[in-house]
Amino acid sequence: MSVCTTAPSATAPDIIRQRGQRTVFCGLTGIVWLHRRIQDAFFLVVGSRTCAHLVQSAAGVMIFAEPRFATAIIEERDLAGRADLDDELDRVVTRLIERRPDIKLLFLVGSCPSEVIKLDLTRAAARLDERFGRLPRILAYSGSGIETTFTEGEDACLEALVPTLADAGSTTSLMVVGAVADIVEDQFRRLFTAIGIERVDFLPARHAGAMPAVGPHTKFILAQPFLAATARALHERGARRIAAPYPLGAEGTRLWIEAAAAAFGIDPARTESVLALPARRATESLAAVRAKLAGRKIFFFPDSQLEIPLARFLARECGVELVEVGTPFLHRDLMDAELALLPFATQLSEGQDVERQLDRCRAEQPDLVICGLGLANPLEAEGIATKWSIELVFSPIHGFEQAADLANLFARPLARRALLSV
């Protein structure tokens, strides 16, 4: 176990780096929002019964509803070597494709059990993809929780998609990277069109056949901060990233769109004229919620990699006092624009040593703690209001029109705690 602190400077707040006991969900939870986003994709987890229970309970979907995800259970006979796992997987995939001809994109999703037994799903996916003539397209990625966070499931999924994207050639385009709700995509598309960016694509697209092309004339901007591997893969295809804060809250959304506009040489006056009204509406809608949050102390446990953009939004637009902002990984190249907007000397922590972080949290007695489900109930029992960080990934929180909804996600636990204390 090691702890080190980076000295403060004009550009970087103190950072506590810790490695110890962790409490996290695995990347399989990403299937919940990814299968809603890509509407003709199927996610086949190769794992244990525990994996199956996790995904089904997180999605809240009954098996008889025939959802677009399932689990190929690794049984004891598989672990004992009495069955050929490749043959078993081929049989399951063949049966699935015969039963669900509507599937256009099939992901084989690795898990902790499949990684422990060294099952090579990437090779299996390539073999099956060729066998079925790419109808459907078959890819693989890891949703394992071994040394990862739950949002890395989306990163791994999109990273697997990037090599399959068509070559854009000389076409100039903007690619928005990261799964967002359909309503958010529609809002962003209208705004980008209004400011004069003609070609806007989203990764992932709503349908497998609509995935964007990529090439040297592609500029991409991240909608989610946890997509480091996807960003690297896009760079390898020749695309260039537009650095910007993330589109959370009125300020973040405005700066995000302005960064894209500047990268495409759009007249700032035109951008301002398009954004003025939605930005003003968002700010006005935030006013009532700000009154409930201003002056409240909030502590972030590291869980989703959304912590720093959320902290920026809460501090600058809601008047919240940041006690500590923990994040599983601090990718400075993806976070520089956000770090510059945080209040000076905001206490950041990278990595997790849960016992030490709990000690710091209890000592500060914050009004609200943002954490994973495993910590929420014990903290609630101690009288500390909590917000599940995973809800912030499941909910539409990006863009101007969702700014007040995002703030309300933090205000509601405080209101509930106040009612319970009466």
Swiss-Prot record:
InterPro entries: LIPOR_BchN/ChlN, Nase/OxRdtase_comp1, Protochl_reductN. GO terms for molecular function: 4 iron, 4 sulfur cluster binding; ATP binding; metal ion binding; oxidoreductase activity, acting on iron-sulfur proteins as donors; oxidoreductase activity, acting on the CH-CH group of donors, iron-sulfur protein as acceptor. The keyword Iron-sulfur applies. Binds 1 [4Fe-4S] cluster per heterodimer. The cluster is bound at the heterodimer interface by residues from both subunits. The keyword ATP-binding applies. Signal peptide: none annotated. Pathway: Porphyrin-containing compound metabolism; bacteriochlorophyll biosynthesis (light-independent). Belongs to the BchN/ChlN family. This is Light-independent protochlorophyllide reductase subunit N. It comes from Acidiphilium rubrum. The gene is bchN.
